[in-house]
């Protein structure tokens, strides 16, 4: 094993997932001077490999959850443990969609870490074939046009919102600040990737689960079942 190689999601297990969640929570708590994160304490060789990851924060209020921040990296610029620590801080304090996380919210925050495979461009002769090629519940998508437009949606997102493949493509275009049908434009690059999700079951990191994107339940269906 060569230190610095890209982490493969097949290498990851519950123990690694627990470390990643712990790193993310400690990184956030450190900003409030409630904990100290020393990455040298995490000397597992897999964590020292370069990695791609996103950290998602959800705020739990009674029986509902809402997004509180999500930031990540799709370039292998640092070891996985460092990527997760940086993404956690950014999700908590630098996501432009939200105000910075407050100390009194920590007890309501569920942390989710998604480790990604390297994105690969999808090349097709006929752009209308794209919805037949991508797989909801398996693929995450990146849409890029030039240097000004880029949007990414994680594999779990279309499952949560009950999207089909064409809607998934359109929503990723919108995320890139492009028209919903941008995926039909040959100058637009479409990339896909896979991911494995580690998630806290409650806001303290004491218990985590491993989630496949295909296992994510549609939030719309859950809402309908409550009526």
From Swiss-Prot:
Pfam families the record matches: AMMECR1 (PF01871)
InterPro entries assigned: AMMECR1, AMMECR1_dom_sf, AMMECR1_domain, AMMECR1_N, AmmeMemoSam_A, Uncharacterised_MJ0810
Residue ranges constituting the AMMECR1 domain according to the UniProt record: 15-209
Signal peptide limits: none
Domain of life from the UniProt record: Archaea
Protein name: Protein LS215_2104
Organism: Saccharolobus islandicus (strain L.S.2.15 / Lassen #1) (Sulfolobus islandicus)
Organism lineage: Archaea, Thermoproteota, Thermoprotei, Sulfolobales, Sulfolobaceae
